[in-house]
């Protein structure tokens, strides 16, 4: 089987000097080398921009959807183990559950073609929705302020189902676990996982940038940022599906034996303030200073805040007259 794919892209835009809009659409469908395996991706986004005097408003909304299916014919390694004398059908043309071993002391190999004819499920889904809104304010030619607010939500799910007729429950590797009267009632397995996370972030930046007396360049900026995120997830395994044509969680007989449900829940809050100062003299020498204070709920109750600072000096040697005449050298900087 040869895996092929297709991909489509589209972009539309329009508007006026004050108001602009654009939208992007992408779709990609890829088939795997194994029959039945595929990856489908869709991404879309829309951007809105509006200018009013010294204010610029922007909003970007995007959505991403991914769906993947694994082949019900098994993995490539299942076929690597096959021998030329293995036949998937018996003399009556019926699919074998297990391929005949070479000798009596060997166990039969599970027939992937037999399992492919069953109603198995092995898929994953992922969805992400994001919205970012920002405002730029040109207070003065050398003084600007920018505010941004963002929110994103992601949901991922996984489904894995083996019907009662699957060779998994009759394999010698199970040591007869599903061959007892109670074991027969437990045949059929469904694993389901779900994780959802939501993130909010906001930040405000005030920036000053001006040149004095044609030689002195000064930049100073302050940024305030806030982030909060929450994540919830769980995984369950159920067994005992009498009807293979109705692989629904509600049709399970019980929770899977020896497989406990699991879950996780986490919440994080973060706050930070950053200050930066940069001074440059005649495009030759410069000084950088920065300081940041971080507050994070992950730090613990005793030390909720931490601070960082840095400083740096630099010399743009390529701006010196004795270097400008060297054509082979266009940049040389010492820090």
What are these regions (language model features)?
Residues 14-16, 48-52, 135-137, 208-210, ...:
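Residue-level signature of outer-membrane beta-barrel architecture
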Residues 1, 32-34, 43-130, 146-148, ...:
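Surface-exposed loop/interface segments of Gram-negative outer-membrane beta-barrel transport/assembly proteins
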Residues 25-31, 287-296:
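Transmembrane beta-strand segments that form the barrel wall of outer-membrane beta-barrel proteins
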Residues 7-29, 33, 43-51, 58-60, ...:
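Predominantly transmembrane beta-strands of Gram-negative outer membrane beta-barrel pores used
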Residues 201, 270-276, 284-286:
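Short glycine-rich loop/turn motifs
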Residues 9, 20-24, 56-60, 134, ...:
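Membrane-spanning beta-strand positions in outer-membrane beta-barrel proteins
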Residues 1-35, 72-75, 115-119, 136-138:
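Residues embedded in well-ordered regular secondary structure
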């Amino acid at each position: 089987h040869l895996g092929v794919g297709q991909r489509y892209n589209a972009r539309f835009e329009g508007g006026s000097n004050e108001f602009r809009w654009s939208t992007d659409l992408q779709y990609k469908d890829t088939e795997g080398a194994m029959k039945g395996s595929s990856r489908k991706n869709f991404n879309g986004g829309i951007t809105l921009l509006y200018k009013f005097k010294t204010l610029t408003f922007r909003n970007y909304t995007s959505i991403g959807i991914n769906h993947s299916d694994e082949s019900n014919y098994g993995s490539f390694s299942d076929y690597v183990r096959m021998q030329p004398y293995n036949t998937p059908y018996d003399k009556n043309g019926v699919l074998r559950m297990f391929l005949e071993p070479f000798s009596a002391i060997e166990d039969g190999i599970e027939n992937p073609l037999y399992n492919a004819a069953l109603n198995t499920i092995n898929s994953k889904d992922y969805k992400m929705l994001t919205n970012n809104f920002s405002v730029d304010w040109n207070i003065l030619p050398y003084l600007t302020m920018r505010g941004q607010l963002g929110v994103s939500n992601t949901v991922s799910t996984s489904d894995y189902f083996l019907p009662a007729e699957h060779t998994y429950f009759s394999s010698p590797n199970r040591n007869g676990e599903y061959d007892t009267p109670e074991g027969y009632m437990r045949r059929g397995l469904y694993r389901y996982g779900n994780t959802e996370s939501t993130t909010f972030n906001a930040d405000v930046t005030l920036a000053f940038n001006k040149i004095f007396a044609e030689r002195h360049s000064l930049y100073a900026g302050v940024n305030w940022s806030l982030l909060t995120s929450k994540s919830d997830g769980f995984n369950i395994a159920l067994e005992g599906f009498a009807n293979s044509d109705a692989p629904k969680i509600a049709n399970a007989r019980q929770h899977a034996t020896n497989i406990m449900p699991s879950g996780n829940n986490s919440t994080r809050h973060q706050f930070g303030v950053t200050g930066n100062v940069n001074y440059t003299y005649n495009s030759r020498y410069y000084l950088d200073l920065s300081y940041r204070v971080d507050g994070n709920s992950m730090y613990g109750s005793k030390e909720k805040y931490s601070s960082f600072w840095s400083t740096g000096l630099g010399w743009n040697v390529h701006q010196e007259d004795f270097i400008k005449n060297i054509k082979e050298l266009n940049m040389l900087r010492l820090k």
